[in-house]
């Protein structure tokens, strides 16, 4: 097989020598290996990445990658992954031919973690072609029939054809393996485009397959993250786009809807909300796209094993603790790799097989394998306060205890209310109550009476930064507690509600959530208000590893003091 060469031809002896060395390196590189199926043609898997700003990598920074342990090193070139790109609107940033996969300038895109996540799972090589520009519409710029504005559809075809043409010219056998698509935010602002997003996406996919002569090209459609400010102030519009995406995935057997509502989101100034994913969100959505592709191949991520030995004796009553919430309860900024042993010599990473642990994270994106030993179990190497909470409680209490964790970091409090909102697919209360009922039923089926020891809920972070939601935060929490108690037939179910410092901004400060919650707790003998205003490692809305450990310990200590 011939190697791939760069578009710009070198001149002079030194340049020719460099090219000669590169050619020989590439001939020994993954370009020359077979694919996972043992294809005799040694086809390279080529993926196309396309979309707008949250595909481009807006508001990301390659220097921030080191903050997030699972992704450290992705600021460096991935020498075994060829990369072709054209980014931007008026002023295009082009690779000028095939280059090595790495951040483009300071931008971090999902392709970095996508490739890194796939390489250990696949034999053979892969390559990425990327064409993206912020502020573009599927109804206009990406419209294959009547492209307008920045005419992204013909640009995409031009870039893909030229990139593939260079591979063909050099004798590289390739296989178009999928389109990774993240777009839709801008179509929200044009009523016609918003209403017809699903039809436009179906037409776009059909036409692209036709133009590329790839009739079965898989398309991985990235969900718009509801953790952004637009997930609140533009909730109905975001919902409309999501319905269009789901419609396209439902009618097209080669299209797949990729859930992204739980991935990280950049924190903006001054109140911590943003509409771009930033560095962490880009890297996490890259993993989700890779996992979607692996599921397409019949593979996919595997979780922790179920308990090998049931920790309770038949007939024993199990005290069940329920942890719930949004971004910090899920553990968005808390990483296992940053965990250090406690001053009391506790090893937070050590599984506790005496505590059965069940969880549903990211609104159901990640779930336990039945009951597991209590241990860090979040996506992307994250964990929540359940780890330190469980260690402290297990040491302090006698008798069997179990834990259930139910979180959705892409939700707001309204999603947890029994009424929900106009965004019907985001209604989380039915999931919440079903998780508790199923956990109780599981334990009872194993012969254990269940004592619901309490719900430990961390008040929604995003709600504190958006006036209309902050205004109704406590009343919505009250509805959640009331309906949960009613549905579980547990009118005296204890709630422990932790509250971090609410967003400090002049207009928002007129809404005194702390006072409202204090008043609610005074009127409810089964509600404990826990003010955690001194946690370490808090930056605006999010709490880091040390702070999440401290939060779990504080929750446990509050419960123990209340007994």
Task: List where the protein language model places each region.
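N-terminal secretory signal peptides that target proteins for export/translocation
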Residues: 1-11
């Amino acid at each position: 097989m011939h190697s791939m060469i760069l578009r710009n031809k070198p001149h002079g002896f030194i340049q020719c020598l460099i090219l000669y060395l590169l050619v020989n390196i590439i001939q020994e590189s993954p370009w020359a290996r077979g694919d996972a199926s043992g294809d005799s043609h040694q086809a390279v898997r080529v993926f196309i990445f396309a979309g707008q700003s949250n595909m481009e990598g807006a508001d990301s920074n390659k220097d921030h990658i080191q903050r997030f342990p699972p992704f450290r090193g992705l600021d460096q070139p991935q020498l075994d992954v060829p990369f072709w790109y054209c980014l931007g609107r008026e002023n295009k940033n082009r690779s000028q031919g095939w280059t090595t996969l790495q951040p483009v300038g300071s931008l971090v895109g999902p392709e970095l973690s996508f490739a890194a996540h796939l390489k250990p799972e696949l034999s053979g090589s892969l390559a990425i072609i990327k064409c993206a520009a912020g502020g573009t519409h599927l109804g206009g710029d990406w419209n294959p029939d009547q492209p307008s504005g920045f005419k992204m559809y013909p640009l995409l075809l031009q870039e893909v054809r030229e990139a593939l043409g260079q591979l063909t010219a050099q004798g590289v056998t390739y296989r178009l393996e999928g389109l990774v698509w993240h777009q839709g935010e801008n179509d929200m602002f044009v009523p016609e485009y918003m209403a017809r997003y699903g039809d436009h996406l179906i037409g776009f996919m059909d036409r692209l397959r036709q133009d590329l002569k790839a009739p079965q090209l898989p398309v991985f459609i990235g969900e718009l993250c509801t953790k952004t400010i637009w997930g609140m102030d533009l909730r109905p519009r975001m919902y409309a786009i999501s319905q269009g995406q789901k419609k396209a995935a439902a009618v097209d057997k080669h299209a797949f809807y990729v859930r992204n509502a739980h991935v990280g989101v950049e924190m903006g100034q001054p109140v911590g909300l943003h509409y771009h994913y930033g560095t962490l969100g880009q890297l996490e959505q890259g993993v989700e796209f890779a996992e979607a592709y692996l599921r397409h191949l019949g593979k996919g991520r595997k979780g922790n094993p179920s308990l090998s030995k049931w920790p309770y004796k038949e007939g024993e009553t199990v005290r069940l603790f329920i942890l719930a919430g949004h971004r910090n309860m899920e553990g968005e900024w808390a990483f296992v790799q940053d965990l250090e042993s406690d001053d009391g010599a506790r090893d937070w990473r050590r599984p506790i097989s005496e505590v059965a642990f069940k969880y549903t994270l990211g609104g159901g994106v990640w779930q336990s394998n039945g009951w597991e030993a209590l241990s860090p179990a979040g996506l992307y190497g994250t964990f929540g306060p359940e780890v330190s909470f469980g260690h402290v409680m297990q040491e302090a209490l006698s008798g069997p205890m179990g834990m259930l964790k139910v979180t959705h970091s892409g939700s707001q409090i309204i999603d947890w209310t029994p009424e929900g909102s106009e965004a019907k697919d985001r209604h989380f209360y039915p999931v919440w109550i079903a998780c508790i009922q199923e956990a109780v039923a599981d334990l009872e089926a194993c012969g254990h009476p269940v004592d619901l020891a309490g719900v430990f809920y961390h008040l929604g972070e995003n709600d504190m930064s958006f006036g209309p939601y902050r205004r109704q935060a406590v009343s919505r929490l009250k509805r959640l507690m009331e309906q949960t108690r009613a549905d579980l037939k547990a009118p005296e179910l204890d709630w422990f509600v932790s509250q971090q410092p609410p967003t400090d901004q002049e207009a928002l400060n007129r809404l005194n959530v702390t006072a409202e919650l204090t008043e609610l707790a005074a009127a409810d003998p089964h509600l404990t208000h826990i003010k955690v205003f001194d946690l370490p490692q808090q930056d605006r809305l999010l709490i880091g590893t040390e702070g999440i450990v401290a939060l779990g310990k504080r929750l446990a200590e509050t419960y123990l003091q209340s007994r």
